[in-house]
């Protein structure tokens, strides 16, 4: 219950310092649940809020040399999730490190306000997960990232006059619940 609020408070505190130094990068870690129905209303609203926070901060801080992006990891392996072949928090950390150390100012300006997939950054910058391999699970592979990018490049159902409401049973079922043993 504190994800979006904490992200906003942190951003509000650090933005003036970044504006003063005329540089900075804010990274919000969200998920595809910010774009399409995933798990439940609370999850989607929180993730959509993070996506909007990044986009709006990019708009307001752009003229001050401060960039803001949203990072979408694939399915993860953490203390509460266990997606087969999933990404570890190390992989997400390496994605942020690549943005900070291996991305030019021009590239950051181009990415400002956008959603970036961890797998896209791994393929571009050549980093791997803690295992020394790229994640290859059905929710974290290159093929999954390619499919997510296609979805992100189209309008969500609520903005598309011909769009259909998602079926919640696709993500709210026993098979998906098994991926969250610690929840």
Named regions from a protein language model:
Residues 13, 17-20, 56-66, 103-107:
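Active-site-adjacent segment of SDR/Rossmann-fold oxidoreductases
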